[in-house]
Swiss-Prot record:
Residues 16-179 form the Helicase ATP-binding domain. It is an enzyme of class 3 (hydrolase). Residues 203-374 form the Helicase C-terminal domain. It comes from Borreliella burgdorferi (strain ATCC 35210 / DSM 4680 / CIP 102532 / B31). This is ATP-dependent RNA helicase HrpA. Changing residue 160 to A: Strong decrease of ATPase activity in the presence of poly(A). Strong decrease of helicase activity.
Length: 823
């Protein structure tokens, strides 16, 4: 493609003229105008980098590297000469470099050394509409620089999303709007029959199949909320690829550069390319020949809970603005089609713009950077969107608990070391602890933190769950997952064929390569401080875990009941079933992560001794931070019940309306019919959120007053054969009784009647960990699930048991998958 034909070149003279006359310029345009690749070149060739550089920030590493390579190629130089880049742990620049691409995090690192950015004549903030925490912080810092440097130019480059806010923030800075030719995109609202992950994937498969059958032209771009959903969807779509005419690629942030670059390949003749992506493809990159978009309408966000210092992972609806951007991907080159997997009414109820990250994240990293560059009044920093005072105060308290800042909001000596590492404060504090007090554990700590800084590496392929779990068990350690991480790393490093190693052990190759890269760079930073790193000899596991514990202070967990723990701030923490640790014996541990999904789950466990904890956490803290179990209880207000009729699927039910909630009674078989005959196709999800259910089987209450959508998820996953059984094996069954074990597994999580109260009891699989298993009725469904998955894990983890039960391998995988769904 001829770059000079891109829409931005029609505005070249205007851009140069405005930038000469103003220090701040806002550029808005849709994706595909050429602003990302051509704006730096236009500014460079116009002579705006005579003394310094043009710095260009990108939110993501993939874009940083690929854009640098593109600009260098089209200017006619090698990367590292006039055009270079710098990302976390990698820099390719030289004294000749005039255009420097970098992630926004890198620019923040540079700001601490060069607070007025004298290295740069121009800073371009690209993708500013994403409004990440780093972008918002950078905007505040460079606004201050513009007051102090008359020669400093700022360009804020954004998609056509609320650009007025940028102009207003920079004292009504001029806006140049670049128009592009866009083609009409037909919007088709086509929600799945059931609004579940599986329902969404099947709907995508159906749409793709129809596109293929109807021989519609062009490649397909599918937007999903996360990596897990992407992998599951690709697995389902591969079933349509028997003729090998589909080229299916995933696209998400942590993929290596080589894998991500494949998506830009020209689609071969008689082939169709399908890209299954997160919101990274919404505005950041341009993929040619996309004519069909399938939009799930969802995105995943992490929300920091200031009360508990934990995160809740939420899948939320995208905004109208994001929906427009996604649809626009189909209309860049010709007419296109966008299938929205939600209803028109749902779209109309959505927010205009996505909520900015600054309102939902931990601000301790930003506050630490403020302290590093000499800002002392954290609460009055000039953010484009001001966070709450409470959020800033919480961040300050976290940093003080890590010994990173003092009462004057200045960096301590420990804080000065922490700021050297491109890690979150909790992680950098752990590394500094090892450097100061446990030098023998520095190497292990760099490995552990590298694992905690990246996404999970343990794979559980469909129908191979049992084999994968057994492979992972090789790295089970009584001191926890954190020790296992070190052993995985060492084996990966030694492996001559790393791809074969990861395949054999059901580990993610790309993830481990990323971990190795991060670990190496952490070592490099430490080495520059002339601190020796001991890699050989006996590892200091105690020093390693104590170091992690010091950084992750808020994630130190104390046992409160059989399977529950609490931290200083949070109650009812549960070890995630994916952990390789045996939970029953663990009284104290530190978690690498605590995140709330259906429950508050701790991951990446390191087992602690009580005496290690006493120096860090005083027991008194628990007394002052108890969370009342009575909090948030629903009380009966005595309001009058109102009887209504409500339609679900094709059936009408009587409903009691009370406290803004409908309560209906449904028979299990009726609900199965509604679900499995896809009768919920035209049901408004917002209406279903207002319904609670009494689920019955004949005269037995299966669930009482349970959220309707939650009940649908349970019944859908448990399947058509979920039923009440009259007889089951009540005695212990030994592993040497394979037929009886088969019966036990078939009955696991079925339910029985409890005559006195006519309530259902769920058959939980339990074990004595000595080869004996039994079914135990439980009133609580989730507790029965938790107990069952622990028991089946103990079964899978014993090779001798599996050999004896090899003939029911499919059944074991099926039960494990069913149980694992709830986590």
């Amino acid at each position: 493609m001829n770059d000079f034909k891109l829409p931005i070149y029609k505005y070249k003279d205007e851009l140069i003229k405005v930038l000469k006359n103003h220090n701040v310029l806002i550029v808005e345009s849709p994706t595909g105008s050429g602003k990302t690749t051509q704006l730096p070149r236009i500014i460079y060739e116009a002579g705006f980098a005579k003394l310094g550089k043009i710095g260009v920030t990108q939110p993501r590493r993939i874009a940083t590297v690929s854009i640098a390579e593109y600009i260098a190629k089209h200017i006619g130089v090698n990367v590292g000469e006039e055009v270079g880049y710098k990302i976390r742990f990698e820099e390719i620049t030289s004294p000749k470099t005039k255009i420097k691409l970098m992630t926004d995090g890198v620019l923040l690192q540079e700001l601490k050394k060069d607070t007025l950015l004298y290295e740069y004549d121009v800073i371009i903030i690209d993708e500013a509409h994403e409004r990440s925490l780093n972008i918002d912080f950078i905007l505040g810092l460079i606004k201050d620089i513009s007051r102090k440097r008359d020669d400093f130019k700022i360009i804020v480059s954004s998609a056509t999303i609320n650009t007025k806010i940028f102009s207003k923030y920079f004292n009504n800075a001029p806006v140049v709007s670049i128009e592009t030719i866009t083609y009409p995109v037909q919007i088709i609202y086509n929600p799945p029959l059931l609004n579940t992950s599986k329902g969404m994937i099947l709907k995508i498969k159906e749409i793709v199949l129809n596109v293929i059958k109807e021989k519609k032209a062009g490649d397909i771009l599918i937007f999903l909320s996360g990596e897990k959903e992407i992998k599951e969807t690709i697995k389902e779509l591969q079933e349509l690829n028997s003729k090998k005419n589909l080229i299916i690629f995933p696209l998400y942030g942590r993929m290596p550069k080589e894998a991500q670059e494949q998506i830009f390949m020209t689609t071969p003749k008689n082939k169709r390319k399908i890209i299954v992506s997160t919101n990274i493809a919404e505005t950041s990159i341009t993929i040619e020949n996309i004519k069909i978009v399938i939009d799930s309408g969802k995105v995943k966000t992490n929300k920091f809970q200031t009360k508990t210092h934990t995160y809740s992972l939420q899948e939320v609806p995208i905004s109208k603005s994001s929906a427009t951007q996604r649809a626009g991907r189909a209309g860049r080159l010709s007419k296109g089609t966008c299938y929205r997997l939600y209803k028109r009414e749902d779209y109309q109820l959505r927010e205009d713009y996505q909520k900015e990250e600054i309102y939902r994240t931990d601000l301790s990293e930003v506050v630490l950077r403020m302290a590093d560059i000499g800002i002392r009044d954290f609460t009055h920093f000039d953010f484009i969107s001001k966070p709450s005072t409470h959020s800033i105060q919480t961040a300050s308290k976290i940093l003080k608990s890590l010994d990173a800042i003092n009462n004057k909001n200045e960096l301590t000596e420990i804080g000065k070391y922490m700021i050297l590492f491109p890690l979150i404060p909790a992680h950098s504090r752990a590394l500094v602890e090892a450097m100061i007090n446990y030098p023998q554990a520095i190497y292990q700590t760099t490995i552990g933190l590298s694992f905690l800084s990246t996404s999970g590496i343990f794979l559980l392929p469909q129908n191979e769950e049992m084999e994968a779990r057994q492979a992972h068990l090789k790295y089970k350690n009584p001191m926890g997952d954190l020790i296992g991480f070190v052993n995985i790393f060492e084996d990966f490093k030694k492996a001559l064929n790393k791809e074969a190693f990861t395949k054999e052990n059901y580990l993610d190759l790309q993830g481990l390569e990323e971990i190795a890269n991060v670990q190496m760079q952490l070592e490099n930073i430490i080495s520059k401080l002339n601190i020796p790193i001991i890699q050989k000899g006996v590892f200091d596991n105690e020093g390693y875990l104590k170091s992690i514990m010091r950084g992750m202070r808020d994630y130190i967990c104390f046992k409160t009941s059989k399977k529950k723990y609490k931290t200083i701030k949070a109650q009812n923490v549960i070890i995630h079933p994916g952990s390789l640790i045996s939970t029953d014996s663990v009284k104290y541990f530190v978690a690498g992560e605590i995140i709330e999904t259906t429950k508050m789950y701790a991951r990446s466990i390191g087992v602690l001794k009580k005496e290690w904890i006493d120096d860090i956490i005083l027991n008194e803290e628990f007394k002052h931070n108890d969370i009342s179990s009575k909090e948030n209880q629903i009380t009966n207000t005595g309001q009058t019940k109102i009887i209504n009729e409500i339609k679900i699927g094709k059936k009408i039910f009587k409903a009691e309306y009370k406290n803004n909630i409908y309560v209906i009674k449904i028979n299990l078989e009726t609900l199965k019919e509604i679900i499995f005959k896809n009768e919920l196709n035209n049901q408004n999800n917002e209406d279903l959120k207002k319904i609670k259910i009494q689920l019955m089987h004949k005269n037995i209450t299966v669930f009482n007053n349970k959220k309707f959508l939650e009940t649908i998820e349970i019944v859908k996953n448990m399947g058509k054969d979920w039923h009440c059984i009259k007889k089951y094996e009540t005695k212990n069954v030994n592993i040497d009784e394979p037929e009886k074990m088969k019966n036990l597994l078939e009955c696991t999580m079925q339910f029985i009647s409890f005559p006195p109260k006519k309530n259902a009891l769920f058959l939980s699989l339990e074990t004595d960990y000595s080869g004996n298993f039994r079914l135990k009725p439980k009133q609580n469904f989730i507790m029965a699930i938790e107990e069952s998955i622990e028991s089946i894990k103990s079964l899978i983890e014993n090779k001798e048991y599996i050999q004896k039960l090899h003939f029911i391998k499919k059944l074991i995988n099926k039960v494990y998958k069913k149980l694992n769904y709830f986590f």
